[in-house]
C-alpha cells in the first residue's frame, strides 16, 4: 500500500493545555530514564565485576535497555507529536507517504513493549529458582546468560513480525498525531499478540512469586526481610502488569472505550508505571545497588541472620554474605 494517507490536524485543542500534558509526562519519564541509565552504568561499567555473575541483574540490565527504548520514543515521538499541536502541521506531511522511519519507530516501540513481558517472565523464574535451589541455581542461569538476553530481544518477533510487512500511517490524535498500521496479514493483530504476552507474564508473576514466597515461609529459619521484600516486589509487578493487561484488554474488547479521550492517557500511564517503576522498585529493594547509586535510604535495613540460618539470595545479593532481598 503505497498511496498517500493525509490528515488534517485538529485545531480544537488549546496549545497550552496540550503542552502541559507533555511536560507532565516528561516530569517522570526523564527522571526514570536517568535512573535506568545510572543503574546500567553501575551494572555494566562501574561495578561490572561485582554484578557480572548475578543472573538476575543480567536480565534486569536487558530490561532496562528495553525501558530506555520505550522512554526515548515516548518522549521524542508519540508524546511530542501528540501533545505539541504546533508541530503537527509542520511534521505530519513527512509521513503522508510510506516512511521507513515511521515503520522502525512503530516496530521498535511495540517490540519493546513485548520484550518487557518476556523479561518479567525470566526475572520471576530466576527468583523462584533461587528460592527452590539457592546453591545450584546461579550456575545453571549463568550458563544461560547469552540465551536469556537473546530470548528477551528475539522472542517478541513472534508478535511484531507483521509490523515489518505492514504499511504505517499517522492519524489525528489530540492536538497532534499518532501512528498505526494497515495489517499486511489480517489475522496477525498486534493487539492480540500484546495481550498474549502480557497475560502470560501476569500469570508467571503470580504463580512464581507465590511459589517463592511459600518456599521462604516454610524454611526452618524464616528470613523475614526476604519475605517482606519479595512480597513488596511481587505486589508491584503484579499490580503493574494487571493495570497494563486491563488497558490492553480494553483496547481489544471495548471499541466504544477507545473513543474516550482518557483511554489513551490511561494506557500511557499504565505502561509508564511499569517502565519507570521497575527502576524505582529495584533501587528500593536492593541495598547494595542503592548504595552504589549513592542513595542512603533503602526499603529496609539489613538485619543479621541468625546463627546457622540459610541465606537465600532472592535476586539482589551478589555474595553469600550480601544483604538479602
Curated annotation (Swiss-Prot):
Superkingdom to which the source organism belongs = Eukaryota
Membrane topology, record value: Multi-pass membrane protein
Pfam families in alphabetical order: Srg
Question: Which GO CC terms are listed, alphabetically?
Answer: membrane
List the InterPro entries hit by this protein, alphabetically: 7TM_GPCR_serpentine_rcpt_Srg, Nematode_SR-like
Report TM segments: 25-45, 65-85, 87-107, 144-164, 187-207, 232-252, 264-284
Enumerate the Gene Ontology biological process terms.
Answer: sensory perception of chemical stimulus
The record's subcellular locations are: Membrane
Q: Which residues form the signal peptide?
A: none
What UniProt keywords apply to this chain's record, in alphabetical order? Membrane, Transmembrane, Transmembrane helix
Q: Which GO terms describe its molecular function?
A: transmembrane signaling receptor activity
Q: Which family does it belong to?
A: Belongs to the nematode receptor-like protein srg family.
UniProt-recorded name of the protein: Serpentine receptor class gamma-16
Name the species this protein comes from: Caenorhabditis elegans
